[in-house]
Amino acid sequence: QIGDNCSIGSNVVIRNSLIKNNVHILDGCVIGKKGFGFFPDKVSNFRYPQIGIVIIDDNVEIGCGSTIDRGSLSNTIIGKNTYLDNQIHIAHNVKIGENCIIAGQVGFAGSSTLGNNVMIGGQAGISGHLKIGSNVQIGGGSGVIKSIPDNSKVMGYPAKDLKKFIRENK
C-alpha cells in the first residue's frame, strides 16, 4: 500500500510494505525483500522466517540505491520526517525514530533501534540488537558496537564519546 503524494523513482522494487503519505523513494531502491538471517547447522543453513513488513511513515525521503529489508518476526519501521541519503542498508527489524538524518553508505545490522532526532555521518556501521537513544549524533566512519544513551555524541571505531575521541586523536 502506497499513500498520497508519494513519488517512486526508476528501477525501484517494493514488496511487503506500507508506505504512508509524502514519501519519496529515489531510483534503484529495494524495499521489503527478505533479510539476511539464518540458523547455522553443521550440514546446512536454514533461513529465518521473514514475515514482517516495512512501514515507512509520513514525510520520508529514501536516497538512491538504498535497501530496507522486511522484518523477520516483527516489522522494520522508518519514522516520520526521516531522511536517508544514498546507498543505505537497513536490515530486518530495525526501527528508526522520527526526524532522523542518515548520511550515505550507513549500514544497520538487524534489530537495532534508533530514537528520535538522531544524526549519523556517512559510512558509519551500526551492529545488531543495539539501542541508540534520542538526540544522538554519530560521526562519519564510526563503528557502533554497543548501545548509546540519549543526548550522546560519539565517533570512532569502536564509537566512543566525541570529547574522548578528540583528546585521544590530537
Regions from the language model: what does each represent?
Residues 1-161:
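Structural signal for interior beta-strand "rungs" in well-ordered beta-sheet cores
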